[in-house]
Amino acid sequence: FRSELIELLLNAAIQAPTAMHEEPCAFVIIQDTQILKTLSEDIKKNIRKQMVSGNSSSEHIVQLVEDDDFNVFYNASTLILICSQFSNKFTSADCWLATENLLLTASASQLGGCVIGLSIDTVNTKKWKDILNIPTGAEVISSVILGIPKETPPASPRKQVKILSWKSLALN
């Protein structure tokens, strides 16, 4: 993708509301296919280690990481990591709001986007923070791949809205 398109997405991301107007988000953009491939392999290796140590994963994830040909990033050309530059009670929520803005803008720009949650543990290791120049104290909160979709899949069915409580003041 052209840098102008990435800048459009990032500018949309930073328009998201933040608690106390702290604006904690910072971004890492990866468009190097070799780095993406190596990172994908490390993620699969780390998930396999977790499985051996007793941390169970869903059967679907187990099948994916056991497949040598599976690329965690689905061979997308661009990965954007949304990071918090510092930590407080609301920074994670702030970064997720930025992630949603980024994804909505990507969709409006005819791009496909997908959150890759499997990557978070690995990109937050010292090894990958060093490779990606993520400073000490910063934390990757979300990970989004972007690409040009071959097709637009139908919307997934959603569960009905579940309202736990609704209290209102009845005006007479």
Task: List the predicted regions and their residue ranges.
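C-terminal helix-cap and adjacent tail motif
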Residues: E66-D67, V140-N172
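Short, surface-exposed beta-edge/turn micro-motifs
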Residues: P24-C25, A76-L79, V140-I141
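N-terminal amphipathic, basic helical "cap/leader" segment at the start of enzyme domains
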Residues: F1-F73, L171-N172
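Small-aliphatic-rich amphipathic alpha-helix that forms the alpha element of a beta-alpha
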Residues: A13, I80, Q85-D130
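A glycine-rich helix N-cap at a beta->alpha junction
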Residues: I47-S53, E59, I131-S156
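Arginine/glycine-rich "motif VI" loop of SF2 helicases in the C-terminal RecA-like domain
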Residues: A19, A106-A108, T136-G137
